[in-house]
Amino acid sequence: MSKTITIADDVYYELVKMKGKRSFSEVLRELIGKKKEGNLDVLMIAFGTMDEEEAKELEEKIKEVGKWLNSWTPV
């Protein structure tokens, strides 16, 4: 099943450069896989939305939210 997403022109052109002969889905899966490995900043920097410091701050905030959510999850 395919989905339509809206992205900024600059992000689109970065994805086009990254994808080569691969599909957009393949590129995004790769980037998401890197995120799952603990490299959220790689995804943010790749799309040019954050510098490395901002990405690290966001990663820390996400970890804090995750801990908070886990504290509310019933066992």
From Swiss-Prot:
Keyword Nuclease: no
Signal sequence segment: none
Pfam families: VAPB_antitox
Keyword Isomerase on entry: no
HAMAP family, per the entry: UPF0330
Function: Possibly the antitoxin component of a type II toxin-antitoxin (TA) system.
Name of the protein: Putative antitoxin PH1062.1
Organism: Pyrococcus horikoshii (strain ATCC 700860 / DSM 12428 / JCM 9974 / NBRC 100139 / OT-3)
